[in-house]
UniProtKB/Swiss-Prot annotation:
Part of the 30S ribosomal subunit. Residues 43-118 form the KH type-2 domain. It is found in: Plastid, Chloroplast. Belongs to the universal ribosomal protein uS3 family. This is Small ribosomal subunit protein uS3c. NCBIfam families: rpsC_bact. HAMAP family: Ribosomal_uS3_B (MF_01309_B). One of its GO terms (biological process) is translation. One of its GO terms (molecular function) is structural constituent of ribosome. PROSITE patterns: KH_TYPE_2, RIBOSOMAL_S3. Keywords: Chloroplast, Plastid, Ribonucleoprotein, Ribosomal protein, RNA-binding, rRNA-binding. The keyword Repeat does not apply.
């Protein structure tokens, strides 16, 4: 059986960069990692609570964290920052203050910036949120997958693969369904592939969504 490696870790240093940029003494590394995870979770929860109600998509593609001696710089890459900014004009300042209180970092200042992504549906995280929203609203999984593929076509991607696993449509036996459009060369290290795995809770149980997007070709 072929084993599937995580496509992002597989390409680190070639087409994929790190989402956390900092150095620490070996004994402090685990603390730094836990802090990063807490920052990411805190931001995601805040955005979830304060987004406009009508939107089921949080629109966070990724969160990058850069740490210096006196500063923690957090860059949130969002597909639809308007939804957050319109619902709370002072949202970013408020988030910054709450995060600073939460982490009580005495000698480190915390700074948050939001960057808009030009083609939000080219990001697997945003697409996975879209599919999750559809599945929660009891839209058929095939319809949700096809709609997601249509949305990526607007973002000029070269290929996409979507996989949903679990008790699909409430069936008794769990199964895996997938659909692919275009090329998705997982074995080519120079191929820029974006990937995410996402868990969605439906009334029938937990479903897992995996999305691979082939962005641009081998140089």
């Amino acid at each position: 059986m072929g084993q599937k490696i995580n496509p992002l870790g597989f390409r680190l240093g070639t087409t994929q960069g790190h989402h956390s940029l900092w150095f620490a003494q070996p004994k402090n590394y685990s603390e730094g990692l836990q802090e990063d995870q807490k920052i990411r979770d805190f931001i995601k929860n805040y955005v979830q609570k304060n987004m406009k109600i009508s939107s089921s998509v949080e629109g966070i593609a990724r969160i990058e964290i850069q740490k210096r001696i006196d500063l923690i710089q957090v860059i949130i890459y969002m597909g639809f920052p308007k939804l957050l900014i319109e619902s709370r004009p002072r949202g970013i300042e408020e988030l910054q203050m709450n995060l600073q209180k939460e982490f009580k970092s005495v000698n480190q200042k915390l700074n948050i910036a939001i960057t808009r992504i030009a083609k939000p549906y080219g990001s697997p995280n945003i697409l996975a949120e879209f599919i999750a929203g559809q599945l929660k609203n009891r839209v058929s999984f095939r319809k949700a997958m096809k709609k997601a593929i249509e949305l990526t076509e607007q973002a000029d991607t070269k290929g996409i693969q979507v996989q949903i696993a679990g008790r699909i449509d409430g069936k008794e036996i769990a199964r895996v369904e997938w659909i692919r459009e275009g090329r998705v060369p997982l074995q080519t290290i120079r191929a820029k592939i974006d990937y995410c795995s996402y868990t969605v809770r439906t009334i029938y149980g937990v479903l897992g969504i995996k999305i691979w997007i082939f962005i641009d070709g081998e140089e």
